[in-house]
């Protein structure tokens, strides 16, 4: 049985919807047709990066209680605090979407330090006169390893999926959770306490990271 409807096979039109670039779509078509091997695609697009995925707490609740505009202002404040930290710690890419922030780093230690410092500065901001009645807090997830340098975040693959799951769905306010591969890259640090987490519905191993002097 053939598919009875039109399929969009134009790489340039597909790319106009900003999923992947035109080159990536063309290479996916080549991969599908056998003109490109898996190894060739991997060699072209793989790179090793640390992914820091951060989510802001209370976005839905603040929108319901204070209105949408106030919730947007909370997001802006969080971005004003977090983005300078990410740049200071060497983030190669920072992207914001709604109440999420994704940053890429060359090494996992920089991502972890950036997460800790973001938490610290958010707390300082929330204690300042600049804060609102419903201040936001950050939840952070960190992954590290080989990902595909494709898509808007230039990091797609298993470690990106895990970091996003930790930062957006599992981590609580002021909490930093890291994947097993990220833990392997930073576990020798004496200034950080790592605690393996155990949850009933846990999909993969992960660790909670906290500074020892806090």
Residue spans for each PLM region:
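Catalytic-site or vestigial catalytic-site microsegments of nucleotide-handling domains
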Residues: 51-61
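Short aromatic/hydrophobic contact patches that present stacked aromatics
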Residues: 100-102, 208
């Amino acid at each position: 049985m053939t598919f009875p409807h039109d399929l969009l096979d134009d790489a340039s039109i597909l790319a106009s919807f900003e999923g992947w670039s035109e080159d990536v779509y063309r290479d996916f078509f080549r991969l599908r047709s056998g003109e490109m091997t898996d190894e060739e695609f991997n060699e072209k697009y793989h790179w090793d990066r640390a992914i820091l995925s951060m989510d802001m707490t209370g976005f839905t609740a603040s929108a319901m209680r204070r209105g949408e505009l106030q919730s947007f202002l909370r997001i802006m404040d969080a971005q004003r605090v977090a983005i300078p930290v990410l740049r200071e710690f060497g983030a190669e890419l920072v992207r914001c979407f709604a109440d999420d922030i994704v940053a890429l780093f060359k090494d996992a230690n920089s991502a972890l330090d950036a997460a800790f410092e973001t938490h610290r500065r958010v707390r300082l901001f929330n204690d300042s006169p600049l804060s609102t009645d419903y201040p936001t807090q950050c939840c952070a997830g960190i992954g590290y390893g080989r990902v595909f340098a494709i898509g808007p975040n230039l990091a797609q693959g298993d470690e990106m999926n895990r970091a996003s799951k930790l930062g957006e769905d599992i981590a609580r306010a002021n909490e930093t959770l890291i994947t097993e591969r990220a833990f392997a890259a930073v576990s020798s640090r004496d200034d950080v306490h790592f605690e393996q987490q155990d949850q009933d519905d846990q999909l993969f191993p992960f660790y909670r990271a906290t500074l020892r002097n806090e």
